[in-house]
A protein has these predicted regions:
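A short, flexible beta-alpha/helix-coil linker loop
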Residues: 15-17, 107-108, 168-171
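Amphipathic alpha-helical effector-binding/dimerization core
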Residues: 9-104
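A structural signal for short hydrophobic beta-strand segments in well-ordered beta-sheet cores
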Residues: 1, 48-49, 151
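Extended hydrophobic
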Residues: 117-189
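Cysteine/selenocysteine-centered motifs that mediate thiol-based redox chemistry or coordinate metal-sulfur cofactors
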Residues: 105-106, 187-193
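Beta-hairpin "wing" of winged helix-turn-helix
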Residues: 1-5, 9
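A generic beta-sheet turn/junction motif
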Residues: 5, 52-54, 155
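Intrinsically disordered, low-complexity polar/acidic regions
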Residues: 110-111, 142
Length: 193
C-alpha cells in the first residue's frame, strides 16, 4: 500500500514470484521423479532452483530425512553468491553477466563462511567450472553443506536452473564427487525427457 495516496500496488517480490512460477511450468515435471530418486539414494534433500534475473528461486524440493532446517524451500529466493544452487548458476553465467553481478560486491553474509567479495567469488567460479559443480561448505547454514550442478538450456546454452542436494556438511564433503556425478546424471535425465 502506498500510504501517500492510499493505493495498493504489488511489490517487486510478487513480480519475481510470478516470473518464477512462469518458468517452472510443466517442462520441470520430469525433475520431480529425478529429485525423489536422488533423495531416496542419498537421504539428502534435493532442490530444483530456477534463475530469475540475479536471484535463484527454488521451485521444487524432495525432503531428505537428515535435516529439516534448510533455508531453501519452494518459493524462497536466494542470491547467486550463497549456497551451491546459486553459486553454480553464477559460475555458468556468461562472463559478462557474471561480471555485472559481481559488480554488486561485497554481498551480505549469512555467516562467516559466506563468500562475499569479488575475489572469493571469482575463485569459486574458477573452481566450480573446473570441477563441474559448486560446493557449499556451511556458507548459508552452519552444519549444512550442499552440492549443485547447472542445468543449461539445450538451445541457447545458457544456465537456466540448478539441481542440488544438501545435508549434514560432513556427509556432503565426504561424498561430494559421487553426489555431483549423481546430480549430473539427474540433469541428463531431465534434459532427455
Amino acid at each position: 500500500m502506498d500510504w501517500s495516496d492510499g493505493n495498493y500496488s504489488l511489490s517487486l517480490d510478487w513480480l519475481r514470484l510470478a516470473d518464477a512460477a512462469r518458468t517452472s511450468r510443466t517442462e520441470w515435471q520430469p525433475a520431480i521423479a529425478v529429485m525423489h530418486a536422488i533423495t531416496a539414494q542419498t537421504g539428502m534433500t534435493s532442490f530444483l532452483s530456477v534463475v530469475s534475473g540475479t536471484e535463484l528461486v527454488c521451485v521444487e524440493c524432495a525432503q531428505g530425512h537428515a535435516i529439516d532446517s534448510l533455508i531453501l524451500r519452494p518459493g524462497r529466493v536466494l542470491p547467486l553468491h550463497a549456497g551451491a544452487a546459486g553459486r553454480v548458476a553464477l559460475a555458468y553465467f556468461e562472463d559478462a553477466d557474471a561480471e555485472r553481478y559481481l559488480a554488486g560486491a561485497p554481498f551480505p553474509a549469512y555467516n562467516e563462511n559466506t563468500l562475499v567479495s569479488v575475489e572469493q567469488l571469482r575463485e569459486d567460479i574458477r573452481l566450480t567450472r573446473e570441477r563441474g559443480y559448486a560446493l557449499s561448505d556451511e556458507d548459508v547454514t552452519l552444519g549444512v553443506g550442499a552440492v549443485g550442478v547447472p542445468i543449461v538450456d539445450n538451445e541457447s546454452g545458457r544456465v537456466i536452473a540448478s539441481l542440488s542436494a544438501g545435508g549434514f556438511v560432513d556427509e556432503v564433503l565426504a561424498t561430494q564427487e559421487s553426489l555431483a556425478a549423481l546430480l549430473h546424471d539427474g540433469v541428463h535425465e531431465i534434459q532427455a525427457a
